Structures are given as structure tokens and as C-alpha cells.
From Swiss-Prot:
One of its GO terms (molecular function) is tRNA (guanine(37)-N1)-methyltransferase activity. It is an enzyme of class 2 (transferase). This is tRNA (guanine-N(1)-)-methyltransferase. It is found in: Cytoplasm. One of its GO terms (cellular component) is cytosol. Keywords: Cytoplasm, Methyltransferase, S-adenosyl-L-methionine, Transferase, tRNA processing.
Length: 262
């Protein structure tokens, strides 16, 4: 996959040349192209912004440099998606990262200053926001989104399961992790993780994911589609967290049918 970023500050993207993204580029699993759209400004002083019509605070990005920069992109050999990073856009979530991971090229337009000339919006296929807060520019948001998408690509993490088990990948928060030593300052690793019993370990992890999501992110828990095997785990959680009982109707249909007597 190719990530193309239109930005006024390409030097801010040093982190994409470290860690997992660095290895992914070395293995030619991803490509990162940084384009300073100031280079496409036609004025003598390379101005990319101007005062807003009608007055007001701040400066507004001019349309000409970004239109020129996008038109100068080489043809994409596959499917290209152009994303305008904007606080007015759809809030970025894991499902969006999964959707984007199926494209061949993502082009991020990073804003700065007070905002964009409205005509710039016509360049994008979609507008996306990192969250309901305001950043100085789109660069940090672009890096976060690139990381979230890249780790879903085959071979980037090394193990497909690593991405599949991450928080939010299945609508649930991730289960707790432990490593050596088995006891640290009186805090012990759960016995089940030391048992070597793979089915019990998987059940424990699923139960803890359900627990964490219910306690920490009830908004996510309200959207979870439960599996057939979740019924007993959820009933156990009700005994530990009685307030969960009010949700029981959501998984009652998963109750195992009583075995017929012969």
C-alpha cells in the first residue's frame, strides 16, 4: 500500500521511519510519499494562505497549491482514496482503518492555519477527523491513521493474530496481558494462563474482554454481537457484576437448549 501525504511540514513525519512502519517500508509492504504542497504555490513568496473573505480571525489555505499538487500525482496502479483531514469529518475508528486497508493508495490532505478554502473539499472522496477536538494541523492525525491502517496489512505485524486480537478489532477491548515473572510485588499472573490448557485460556481471554468492555466502554459493549459461546461467560460475569443483568435480554437467545432425555 502507498500512503501519500500533502503537507506543509513533511519534517513532522520522522516517526513513520521508525519501528514497525520502518520495517514495513524496508520490506516494501508500504510506501510513504511526502509532498510539500508549498512547492506548488505560484506566488513569488510561495504563499499558501490568505485572509478570509468577509473578515475573521486567522488565515485560510488557498485552493491553487493543493489543486496543483493533487493533479501532479502520478497515476495510481490501483485504487486510490483521497482523504481530507478535518475536524468536521467522520470520526476515525477501527472499522474505517479496516475499510481503508483494502485500498491500494491513501492520499491524506493535511490542513493548517484557520482552515481550508471551501473549494478544496471538492478534491476529497471523504473527510475524516481523529476526534472531537482541534489540532494545529492534520499531520498528527495522518500519522495515527497511517499506523492504524498499516498494521492491518499482511506481513506488517508478522502475525495476523496480533492485529485481529487488538482492542476494537472485534468490537471489544483487548484482554489483559502478562509476562514473566509469575509473581511481582505480590501481584500474581492468573493460574489459567500458566495451565497450558488452550481452550480454558481462550475462554478466560474472551471473558476478560467482555468484562473490560462492559466496565470501561459501555458504549462499545452496547454494540457487541455476541457469539454462541458467550452465554455462559456472560452469566458468570453477571454473578461478579450484578449490574450487567440489565443487559441479559441481548444474549438470552444464545441460551443452550436443554438436552432431551432418552
Amino acid at each position: 500500500m502507498k500512503f501519500t501525504v500533502l503537507t506543509l511540514f513533511p519534517e513532522m513525519f520522522a516517526p513513520v521511519h521508525e519501528s514497525i512502519l520502518k520495517r514495513a517500508q524496508a520490506a516494501q509492504l508500504i510506501e510513504v510519499s511526502l509532498i510539500n504542497f508549498r512547492d506548488y504555490a505560484a506566488s513569488k513568496h510561495k504563499n499558501v494562505d490568505d485572509v478570509p473573505y468577509g473578515g475573521g480571525a486567522g488565515m485560510v489555505l488557498k485552493p491553487e497549491p493543493l489543486f496543483a499538487a493533487l493533479r501532479d500525482l502520478p497515476p495510481s496502479p490501483g485504487r486510490r482514496r483521497i482523504v481530507l483531514l478535518s475536524p468536521q469529518g467522520e470520526v476515525f475508528q477501527q472499522r474505517k482503518a479496516e475499510e481503508w486497508s483494502r485500498w491500494d493508495e491513501l492520499v491524506f490532505i493535511c490542513g493548517h492555519y484557520e482552515g481550508f478554502d471551501e473549494r478544496i473539499r471538492s478534491l476529497a472522496d471523504e473527510e475524516v477527523s481523529l476526534g472531537d477536538f482541534v489540532l494545529t494541523g492534520g499531520e498528527l492525525a495522518a500519522m495515527v491513521m497511517m499506523d492504524a491502517v498499516a498494521r492491518l496489512l499482511p506481513g506488517v505485524l508478522g502475525e495476523k493474530a496480533s492485529a485481529e486480537e487488538d482492542s476494537h478489532s472485534g468490537g471489544l477491548l483487548e484482554y489483559p496481558h502478562y509476562t514473566r515473572p509469575p509473581v511481582f510485588e505480590g501481584m500474581e499472573v492468573p493460574d489459567v494462563l500458566l495451565s497450558g490448557h488452550h481452550r480454558r485460556i481462550e475462554e478466560w481471554r474472551r471473558k476478560e474482554s467482555l468484562r473490560r468492555t462492559f466496565l470501561k466502554r459501555p458504549d462499545l459493549f452496547a454494540k457487541v454481537e455476541f457469539r454462541a459461546g458467550d452465554f455462559n461467560l456472560l452469566e458468570e460475569l453477571i454473578r461478579e457484576h450484578p449490574e450487567l443483568a440489565q443487559e441479559r435480554s441481548r444474549w438470552e437467545h444464545l441460551r443452550p437448549k436443554p438436552k432431551k432425555r432418552r
